[in-house]
């Protein structure tokens, strides 16, 4: 899909160098957007690949977004490079599996710092510029995990429920400034991490059978929804959660 108003749009993405985040970064680059992203691991090779493919190099800032000071500095650096942020995509997350009875206070705090706290403070950081501009779009990547009541990673599920509450609250608070805040809840997307750590033929087959649409979900299947919510095509949409899941939530 082509969204012509995204050309030269200044975009900031968390976790934009791998998995779904990399697909989102690439999609914006293909639209001609000016993309900056943060990630904890080195993404220089990915940036080289994108520059060669699109002649449009994303600006990579290496940092741990659970460190709010480092996150704020990253946003400032992106602003200095490309100008004020017009689109924020909160994407970075960690869905490591864990047991309720074994979760320590430190694990819980670390999980929430990455999966929820960083989302809030990245919103806070970019909102100042968006208020001044009287425009902006924030897209929070959530998950269908809380809608399904998934077991096996309760801290992550809790954070995703919180993301959706935060999305609605910020949409209401900042709509007066023509800032839109929405969330996307992907289904089980076959990233390299998922395939390496958690996918088995049996689990995948059972999941696909529950989807209304029987196709595997790939990172590229998520990106058009992100572009739509970033563009003026969705100018009357805010405070919403869009499930991109093949219909698995519909079947329960």
Which residue stretches match the model-derived regions?
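Conserved glycine-rich Rossmann-like NAD(P)H-binding loop of the short-chain dehydrogenase/reductase
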Residues: 31-46
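Alpha-helical segment proximal to the catalytic Tyr-Lys
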Residues: 128, 172-176, 235
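Residue(s) in the substrate-gating loop at a strand-loop-helix junction
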Residues: 143
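Conserved glycine-rich cofactor-binding loop
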Residues: 10, 17-18
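Substrate-binding pocket helix/loop in short-chain dehydrogenase/reductase
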Residues: 99-100, 104-112, 207
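Short C-terminal tail/terminal secondary-structure segment
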Residues: 1-5, 148, 226-227, 238-252
């Amino acid at each position: 899909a082509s969204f012509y108003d995204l050309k030269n749009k200044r975009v900031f993405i968390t976790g934009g160098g791998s998995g779904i985040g990399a697909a989102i970064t690439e999609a914006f680059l293909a639209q001609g957007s000016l993309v900056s992203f943060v990630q904890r691991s080195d993404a220089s090779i990915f940036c080289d690949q994108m520059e060669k493919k699109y002649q449009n190099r994303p600006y990579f800032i290496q940092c741990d977004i659970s460190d709010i000071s480092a996150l704020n500095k990253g946003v400032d650096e992106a602003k200095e490079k490309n100008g004020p942020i017009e689109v924020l995509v909160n994407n970075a997350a960690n869905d490591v599996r864990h047991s309720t009875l074994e979760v320590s206070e430190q694990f819980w705090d670390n999980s929430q710092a990455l999966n929820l706290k960083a989302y809030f403070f990245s919103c806070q950081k970019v909102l100042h510029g968006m208020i001044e501009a009287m425009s902006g779009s924030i897209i929070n990547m959530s998950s269908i995990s809380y809608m399904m009541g998934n077991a096996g990673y309760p801290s992550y599920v809790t954070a995703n429920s919180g993301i959706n509450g935060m999305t609605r609250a910020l949409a209401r608070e900042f709509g007066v400034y023509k800032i839109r805040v929405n969330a996307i809840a992907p289904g089980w997307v076959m990233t390299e991490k998922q395939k390496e750590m958690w996918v088995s033929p049996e689990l995948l087959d059972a999941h696909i059978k529950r989807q209304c649409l029987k196709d595997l979900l790939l990172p590229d299947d998520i990106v058009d929804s992100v572009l739509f919510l970033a563009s003026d095509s969705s100018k009357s949409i805010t405070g919403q959660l869009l499930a991109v899941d093949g219909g698995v939530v519909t079947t329960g």
